[in-house]
Amino acid sequence: LTDNEFNVEEELNLNSKVLHWVVPTKGAYETHRQINNLNEGMSHFDMMHFLKNKWLGWGKTKELVHVTYNGMTFDEELFRRQFYWNLIDPYLTTNVNGSSRVDLMVIMFLIANFFSDKVKIPTDDEGNLRYKLEMVAEANGISSLNAHDAVVDSYLMINLVRLINEKIPQLWKSAVSTATKKDFIVAINKEPFSMFAEIVKGQAFNYPVYPCAQNSKKPNEVLLVDLYFDPKELFEMSYSELKGQIGKSGAFKKIAINKTCLLYTSPSPRDTR
């Protein structure tokens, strides 16, 4: 837990015994380099309820922003399953006391496209962007010793966020101000356009986009139109032709607003005011 200046107020380092039905693997223990949970520690049930109570306690006096790295596909799903298994609200990180979340890896995609002169994104020998947490940290002078340990990775993220807030304050402000679905929808409809950024096969790409539809049956799905495409040509297309434009190389991009989105909502990405 940190304050608004990213000073650590409290640290958690929790372990539980391996679940009875889990078969430990050599590769997993080589990654996190700890074996004490084979025979020691609290039960998995007790650990998850301790974490729940701790997060709820923090949220009584603060509107929490849960920051992860690649959390949309790993951490979030992991926590939801663990909470659900132990009879806890699986959406604890997003639905309690104004809590929200930011996936820092997505922020790196935006940095690679618009702010690579401020924060470094490393490349390999072939010039492909590499954005693993420890690689980005090292490229910016942050030691990644003992990376993949949960506490160490948390400090890597804190130091990276502190750096981003120092070098690109408008980007971090944009990420936090659009960290909830409601605020995100307001932001992308208010600005003249937003910038969609991604990294594909090690290369950075970006597009000016604007929302054009929201799925009435699945309101978390929003359709964006790529403003690089000529709207006159789109208006002349048939329904089937328009449907064929939805996808990676088409005029329409589908996003999920219940996840950190690859969008920068500032009117001018390089505006440093």
Question: Model features per residue range: what roles?
Answer:
Residues 35-42:
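Glycine-rich phosphate-binding "P-loop"
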